[in-house]
From Swiss-Prot:
Annotated source species: Taeniopygia guttata
Protein family per UniProt: Belongs to the EGR C2H2-type zinc-finger protein family.
Domain of life of the organism encoding this protein: Eukaryota
Ranges of Low complexity composition bias in the record: 85-109
UniProt comment concerning the protein's domains: Binds to DNA motifs with the sequence 5'-GCG(T/G)GGGCG-3' via its C2H2-type zinc fingers. The first, most N-terminal zinc finger binds to the 3'-GCG motif, the middle zinc finger interacts with the central TGG motif, and the C-terminal zinc finger binds to the 5'-GCG motif. Binds double-stranded target DNA, irrespective of the cytosine methylation status. Has reduced affinity for target DNA where the cytosines have been oxidized to 5-hydroxymethylcytosine. Does not bind target DNA where the cytosines have been oxidized to 5-formylcytosine or 5-carboxylcytosine.
Protein name: Early growth response protein 1
Record field: compositional bias (Basic residues): 69-79
Keywords annotated in UniProt: Activator, Biological rhythms, Cytoplasm, DNA-binding, Metal-binding, Nucleus, Repeat, Transcription, Transcription regulation, Zinc, Zinc-finger
Gene Ontology CC: cytoplasm; nucleoplasm; nucleus
The gene coding this protein: EGR1
MF terms in GO: DNA binding; DNA-binding transcription factor activity; DNA-binding transcription factor activity, RNA polymerase II-specific; double-stranded methylated DNA binding; hemi-methylated DNA-binding; histone acetyltransferase binding; promoter-specific chromatin binding; RNA polymerase II cis-regulatory region sequence-specific DNA binding
Length: 193
């Protein structure tokens, strides 16, 4: 590749790139490395050794470049503190967007909003229907008979549901005579109900 080196060990290390030679082997996992310092760093993953400590917070690292990258975090934090502490030298008509002051306004007002979901349906018959906020809808058993011109509408409703705003457990049997609403509905409408 026509590269030149002043030291023979640098040339030897470089030639390994071209030949793919990896003479340094980890005795724990048998992984091979072209450089001895890479093997030394790798062995730290097995031993858990972390010889490079941060001078500011004391956190330890296995590699010096990891410590160097970590130290930059502290420098950025320090720069931010200096920016926040330094007063503005020129007055600007536009306020700064970043501020070290946090303002909160406590309120004793509790705001509630009506639910957009209706909890009951109006019914032409004096009976009760399940709420639309049910998580399950049981199938009602409906039996309609017409002995001598009178109608009987029987429904068994056993519903249990939980909702953040509503907590009801109820079981009821609704039996109502439809003879009082026969004038309002045709026999076909009563069959559908």
């Amino acid at each position: 590749c026509d590269r030149r080196f002043s030291r023979s060990d640098e040339l030897t290390r470089h030639i390994r790139i071209h030949t793919g030679q990896k003479p340094f082997q980890c005795r724990i996992c048998m992984r091979n490395f072209s450089r001895s310092d890479h093997l030394t760093t790798h062995i730290r993953t097995h031993t858990g050794e972390k010889p490079f400590a941060c001078d500011i917070c004391g956190r330890k690292f296995a590699r010096s470049d990891e410590r160097k990258r970590h130290t930059k975090i502290h420098l950025r934090q320090k720069d931010k503190k200096v920016e926040k502490a330094a007063p503005a030298s020129t007055a600007s008509p536009i306020p700064a967007y970043s501020s070290s002051v946090t303002t909160s306004y406590p309120s004793s007002i509790t705001t509630t909003y009506p639910s957009p979901v209706r909890t009951a349906y109006s019914s032409p018959a004096p009976s009760s229907y399940p709420s639309p906020v049910h998580t399950t809808f049981p199938s009602p058993s409906i039996a309609t008979t017409y002995p001598s011109g009178t109608a009987t509408f029987q429904t068994q409703v056993a519903t249990s549901f939980s909702s953040p705003g509503v907590a009801n457990n109820f079981s009821s049997q609704v039996t109502s005579a439809l003879s009082d609403i026969n004038s309002a509905f045709s026999p076909r409408t009563i069959e559908i109900c």
